[in-house]
Amino acid sequence: MAEIIQERIEDRIPELEQLERIGLFSHAEIKAIIKKASDLEYKIHRRTLLKEDFINYVQYEINLLELIQRRRARIKYSFKKDEIEYSMVHRVQGVFGRASAKWKDDVQLWLSYIVFCKKWGTKTHLSKIFSAMLAIHSNKPALWIMAAKWEMEDRLSSESARQLFLRALRFHPECPKLYQEYFRMELMHAEKLRKEKQEFEKAAMDMGDFDHPEEILKGELARIIYKNSISKIKGAEFHVSLLAIAQLFDFAKDLQKEIYDDLQALHTDDPLTWDYVARRELEIESQPGEEQPVSKQAKAVEMGRREERCCAVYEEAVKALPTEAMWKCYITFCLERFSKKTSSVPLRGQRLERTMLAFRKAHELKLLSEVQYKQWIDLLLRQDLFKEALQVAEAGTELFKDSVTMWQTKLQVLIDSKSPDVEMRFEEAFAHLKPQVCLPLWISWAEWSESAKSQEDTEAIFKKAIIAVTGASSVTLKEKYLDWAYRSGGYKKARAVFKSLQESRPFSVEFFRKMMQFEKEQEPCKMVNLREYYERALREFGTSDSDLWMDYIKEELNHPFGKPENCGQIYWRAMKMLQGQSAELFVAKHAMHQAGH
């Protein structure tokens, strides 16, 4: 092994001598490079090979290459690249080759190899790398697409890209992304041929080998892919994705029309089809051939007409397809348009009216989802229509009695409208909902009570909540209760609440840390109380939380009434209680602290 390493170091000598001779590196730097290179070579030639060693080797060489580039730029010296950089790049490729052969399954390693070759100008090597990678990772469509794009965009070889896509589709005959990218590639190829033809015609040159059939120039190959793909992959979503790609190419108008017509013919029962057809009206001028509107008012009128046409299509859609999904598309469109900024008051009014009407119609047909009831309520509240918002909230909770979100929305409307029935409605919500989902409502009730009721009433709510909410959900509630106690009654009240809850498991570390913080804000801050809180916290989390132990030690060291002599005992207790990685982490933190970091 020593002979191999020596030989590889000797292979570096010519490039290192050149680096020193042309003044890019000093003699001392060259010696440091040789020492580092020897260490790295040893690691990648020992019997037990580690991937990290190969990665470190490559990273060191890349860093060195980049440093050479920067120093070349600084002294404006660009010669001897074949003797320096090319030699280094070739060596890195060899290391990447060994690593990718050893760890074939590591996709990230292959991708790093590819990125390196692209950056350092060894693109001729890339075809072989892609072939080797795809032989192992043929089950990953994204890698086939990457290879095909490289052939098309970097090597300008549409034929090689086409062959890769065809091979990929044999492995993945029902992969939408492959068909989409293959379709895009053929359209790009046709566009490129058309531009070449135009250039030849402009120059009045003989077309020769560039004289392609008219069908190819019109995108016939893309059309064949489209037809094959829709026979394999069903659904309007895929169909629409191909149409969106085709619309990027102006020459493909006939293909766009064919795809659009097929979409309407094949997917009339899919809400996405209707949604696409309706939204398309936004792009079509109301009166083709006429001058475009110039003034803001004229533009607003034109936009109003387009939106009206969209809504007419949606109205037809919800009659033909009266489903929740179809109404969702319609309402989403209305909300999107209403959220668009406009200085036109009439246009904004039209948008609001259309949105409200769509919500009402869907509600009457019982085709509104829970989310849309919430959207409707939010919209009404933004317009200060509290009475209508409450009516909608009532209807929503009737339909979705088991939804805590719906109840919370309704209760928030009652709170915002300063209803006298808030307390009664909270009780009603708890009667309908399962206790384990009620945490958000208990918190809302307590927050409302804090601003609207007496301290006694608020505490009564917290006490009820602690009994009602059990398990992990109760942790947040206890923290909220402690916070409220400190806000409303100061430290004395918070300590009383802490004492009352200290056996009501489960807890969070934050629960104890809050109490420690409250203590630290007192004058004087009593170390005896801090010890009590740390001990209570460690009883619950001493086996896993290394930070608690470290903070306890620091407290004894830094507090005016701390006992530094206790630190040794705390350290050994921590070592006994902490388990696994937590113990290792604690030892490392303790060592850092002792070293003054």
Curated annotation (Swiss-Prot):
Keyword Repeat found: yes
Record's subcellular location: Nucleus, Nucleolus
HAT repeat segments: 121-153, 156-188, 304-335, 488-520, 524-557
GO molecular function: snoRNA binding
UniProt keyword Coiled coil present: no
GO cellular component: chromosome; nucleolus; small-subunit processome
Family annotation (InterPro entries): HAT, TPR-like_helical_dom_sf, Utp6, UTP6_C, UTP6_N
Chief place where the protein resides: nucleus
GO-annotated biological processes: maturation of SSU-rRNA from tricistronic rRNA transcript (SSU-rRNA, 5.8S rRNA, LSU-rRNA); ribosomal small subunit biogenesis
Keywords: Nucleus, Repeat, rRNA processing
Domain of life per record: Eukaryota
The name this protein goes by in its record: U3 small nucleolar RNA-associated protein 6 homolog
Quaternary organization: Part of the small subunit (SSU) processome, composed of more than 70 proteins and the RNA chaperone small nucleolar RNA (snoRNA) U3.
Similarity comment: family membership: Belongs to the UTP6 family.
Name of the gene encoding the protein in the UniProt record: Utp6
Pfam families: U3_assoc_6, UTP6_C
Functional description taken from the UniProt entry: Part of the small subunit (SSU) processome, first precursor of the small eukaryotic ribosomal subunit. During the assembly of the SSU processome in the nucleolus, many ribosome biogenesis factors, an RNA chaperone and ribosomal proteins associate with the nascent pre-rRNA and work in concert to generate RNA folding, modifications, rearrangements and cleavage as well as targeted degradation of pre-ribosomal RNA by the RNA exosome. Involved in nucleolar processing of pre-18S ribosomal RNA.
